[in-house]
Curated annotation (Swiss-Prot):
Keyword presence, Ribonucleoprotein: yes
Role summary: This protein binds to the 23S rRNA, and is important in its secondary structure. It is located near the subunit interface in the base of the L7/L12 stalk, and near the tRNA binding site of the peptidyltransferase center.
Listed Pfam families: Ribosomal_L6
Designated name of the protein: Large ribosomal subunit protein uL6
Length: 177
């Protein structure tokens, strides 16, 4: 029995949810998202709560049960509040700036890295050493933040590079003489 899957998902105020077979659609103040559940689970909308149940007791159905419930919860929260991920840049001369819709990063390479902002994502640079990625799709926000971090991940000796704001870098000691 899935501990996460058996909890019903409350539809937040200001959000309308619609279940059409396996497709769950959510409309809210920030936009509209949908999720198509696997055939191994059944999705029902009962008095402003979405209930997800496995079709049978197979291991595959039970594995997809909790994941489907969490995906539905993520789209309901995304269209109401949205998601955001903060990144920090550490290092001498390392900085970020916006050039139109593109993010320009100076990360110690011989050239600046230009990252094209995907559709549905907003990137803000409040300070030259801080990047805020926001959007309504949790998976897409996390993916964009990971792609930006990947250009120059934090190194363990001085901590230089791009890291998540809440990330703690485990530091190493340098060589001994």
């Amino acid at each position: 029995m899935s501990r996460i899957g058996k909890k019903p998902v409350q539809v937040p105020a200001g959000v309308t949810a619609n279940v059409d077979g396996q497709k769950v659609t959510a409309k809210g103040p920030k936009g509209e998202l949908f999720f198509v559940a696997n055939d191994e689970v059944s999705v029902k909308l009962e008095n402003n709560t979405v209930v997800v149940q496995p079709v049978n007791e197979s291991k595959d159905a039970r594995a997809k049960w909790g994941m489907s419930r969490t995906m539905i919860e993520n789209i309901l929260k995304g269209v109401k509040d949205g998601y955001e991920r903060k990144l920090e840049i550490n290092g001498v001369g390392y900085r970020a700036s916006m050039q139109g819709k593109n993010l320009q990063l100076a990360l110690g390479f011989s050239h600046d890295v230009v990252y094209q902002t995907p559709e549905g994502i907003t990137i803000a640079v409040p300070k030259p050493t801080e990047i805020v990625v926001s959007g309504i799709n949790k998976q897409q926000v996390g993916q964009v933040a990971a792609e930006i971090r990947e250009y120059r991940g934090p190194e363990p000796y001085k901590g230089k590079g791009v890291k998540y704001a809440e990330e703690r870098i485990v530091r190493k000691e340098g060589k001994k003489k």
